[in-house]
């Protein structure tokens, strides 16, 4: 299927000198990713516009040299894309499923991404171990649940960047109660990549304004995972 993975002129301009690495990643998604059920075959013709470029424009919101955790990384969207486009970032791909972490490790090795590590686990299992300036998430969970998983991973002043669709504003309203239960934060909906991608990428940004006090447990999600399995959420990853 790799013959269908041809970057547009807009993609060439956006990725610039990192395009060859991005092209190789797109080919891995179209070939190995499809074969292992990590991405649907119907997505291959639109890998660049709907997936890689949609993720890439989020880099506008990430400060230079930031530590990034890509929560529920799946096949590496957006974490691998951001690591390719921004070598200054230190990216942790956090993913609980073995078959996905195997693929992610293969990508990191084949693409020679020295700024990436793959960590197998669930967000709630690593709240005491990992911290970042930015947590990204795409097609992982409804916003109220995602907030409970992501915010404890953030340093003071850090932001959750949740890539969402047309219901972004509605999801944010539905998450107001959960936001109030967490440490102080500021939440908004922004659109990035105007003029580069059409439509622009919609992001719910939640920035925490205080540090998580030492010895203080983060407020748990109102909808915790059930023991013994991971409930399927959103699109197939």
Curated annotation (Swiss-Prot):
<dbReference type="GO" id="GO:0070043">
    <property type="term" value="F:rRNA (guanine-N7-)-methyltransferase activity"/>
</dbReference>
<keyword id="KW-0489">Methyltransferase</keyword>
<keyword id="KW-0808">Transferase</keyword>
<keyword id="KW-0949">S-adenosyl-L-methionine</keyword>
<dbReference type="GO" id="GO:0005829">
    <property type="term" value="C:cytosol"/>
</dbReference>
<keyword id="KW-0698">rRNA processing</keyword>
<dbReference type="Pfam" id="PF02527">
    <property type="entry name" value="GidB"/>
</dbReference>
<feature type="binding site">
    <location>
        <begin position="123"/>
        <end position="124"/>
    </location>
    <ligand>
        <name>S-adenosyl-L-methionine</name>
    </ligand>
</feature>
<feature type="region of interest" description="Disordered">
    <location>
        <begin position="210"/>
        <end position="237"/>
    </location>
</feature>
<protein>
    <recommendedName>
        <fullName>Ribosomal RNA small subunit methyltransferase G</fullName>
        <ecNumber>2.1.1.-</ecNumber>
    </recommendedName>
</protein>
<comment type="similarity">
    <text>Belongs to the methyltransferase superfamily. RNA methyltransferase RsmG family.</text>
</comment>
<keyword id="KW-0963">Cytoplasm</keyword>
<feature type="compositionally biased region" description="Basic residues">
    <location>
        <begin position="223"/>
        <end position="237"/>
    </location>
</feature>
<dbReference type="InterPro" id="IPR029063">
    <property type="entry name" value="SAM-dependent_MTases_sf"/>
</dbReference>
<feature type="binding site">
    <location>
        <position position="72"/>
    </location>
    <ligand>
        <name>S-adenosyl-L-methionine</name>
    </ligand>
</feature>
<comment type="function">
    <text>Specifically methylates the N7 position of guanine in position 518 of 16S rRNA.</text>
</comment>
<feature type="binding site">
    <location>
        <position position="138"/>
    </location>
    <ligand>
        <name>S-adenosyl-L-methionine</name>
    </ligand>
</feature>
<feature type="binding site">
    <location>
        <position position="77"/>
    </location>
    <ligand>
        <name>S-adenosyl-L-methionine</name>
    </ligand>
</feature>
<dbReference type="InterPro" id="IPR003682">
    <property type="entry name" value="rRNA_ssu_MeTfrase_G"/>
</dbReference>
């Amino acid at each position: 299927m790799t013959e269908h993975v041809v970057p547009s002129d807009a993609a060439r301009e956006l990725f610039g000198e990192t395009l060859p690495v991005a092209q190789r990643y797109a080919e891995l998604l179209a070939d190995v990713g499809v074969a292992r059920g990590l991405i649907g075959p119907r997505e291959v013709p639109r890998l660049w516009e709907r997936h890689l470029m949609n993720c890439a424009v989020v880099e506008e919101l990430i400060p230079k040299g930031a530590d990034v955790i890509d929560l529920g990384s799946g096949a590496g969207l957006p974490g691998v894309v951001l690591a390719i486009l921004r070598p200054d970032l230190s990216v942790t791909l956090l993913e609980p499923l073995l078959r996905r972490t195997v693929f992610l490790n293969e990508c990191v090795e084949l693409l020679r991404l020295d700024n990436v590590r793959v960590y197998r686990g669930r967000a709630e299992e690593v709240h005491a171990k990992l911290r970042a300036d930015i947590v990204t998430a795409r097609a992982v969970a409804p916003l109220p649940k995602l907030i409970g998983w992501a915010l404890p991973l953030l340093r003071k002043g850090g932001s959750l960047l949740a890539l969402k669709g047309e219901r972004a504003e509605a999801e944010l309203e539905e998450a107001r109660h959960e936001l109030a239960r967490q440490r102080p934060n500021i939440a908004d909906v922004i659109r990035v990549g105007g003029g580069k991608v059409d439509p622009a990428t919609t992001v719910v940004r939640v920035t925490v304004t205080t540090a998580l006090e030492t010895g203080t447990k983060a407020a748990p999600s109102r909808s915790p995972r059930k023991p013994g399995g991971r409930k399927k959420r959103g699109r197939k990853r």
